[in-house]
Amino acid sequence: MQGRVQPFDPGALAPAQRELFEAIAGGPRAQGPQHFALTRPDGSLRGPFNAFLLAPELGGALQSLGAAIRYRGALTARAREIAILLVAAHWDSEFEREAHQAVGAASGLTPDELAALHDGDPTAFAGDEGVVATATVQLLAGDLDDELWRVASEAIGAEVVFELTTLVGYYSTLALQLRVFRVAP
């Protein structure tokens, strides 16, 4: 698939683009174990991050939101990756799926759990993870019914339901951007 936006040359970025590039390539995503490459061999950004450079102010806000979800949220790593992979399955987002299957495996998701998530199946999970999975599927349909709201707010708390809702919206936005800009994995 030919991308609609060519990779931005890291050596030819405007100041606002350079600042955003550094926040992505040198921020928390670049620290610790790397489960997927943030950059191509030529140093340009991969995935949704290249398109962020089209509008650095908005891209910067998205980058900050994504970093907050990934590194400062209350969801466990497993629960977060369950939700992200269900979003990837819903939107059939190859890049999100590829990137987050590796992160999910590193967070302890088993091959059987990853296969269920690939198929968009939330039933492989129990307890709080089951609540997160079921709530994610409902959120992807556009709402959370009263019964699941009650269960989720009691099990994981209203603040974590807020976080989950934000995560689903953020990764759905990325999936749409990846599709519109024809970003290959």
List each model region and its residues.
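Mobile cap/lid helix-loop segments that border enzyme active or cofactor-binding sites
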Residues: M1-L75
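Short alpha-helical scaffolding segments that buttress acidic/His motifs in well-ordered protein cores
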Residues: P48-F52, L62-I69, I82-A88, L117-H118, ...
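Conserved alpha-helical segments that form or flank metal/cofactor-binding pockets of metalloenzymes
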Residues: L58-G60, V87-S107, P111
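Extended, structured, electrostatic nucleic-acid-contact surfaces
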Residues: L65, L144-V151
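C-terminal end-helix/capping segment
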Residues: V103-E113, L117, L178-P185
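A contiguous pocket-lining binding segment that forms or flanks enzyme active sites
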Residues: S107-A135
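Alpha-helical transmembrane segments and membrane-interface helix-loop junctions
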Residues: D143-L144, P185
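Transmembrane-helix boundary/entry motifs in multi-pass membrane transporters
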Residues: G157-A158
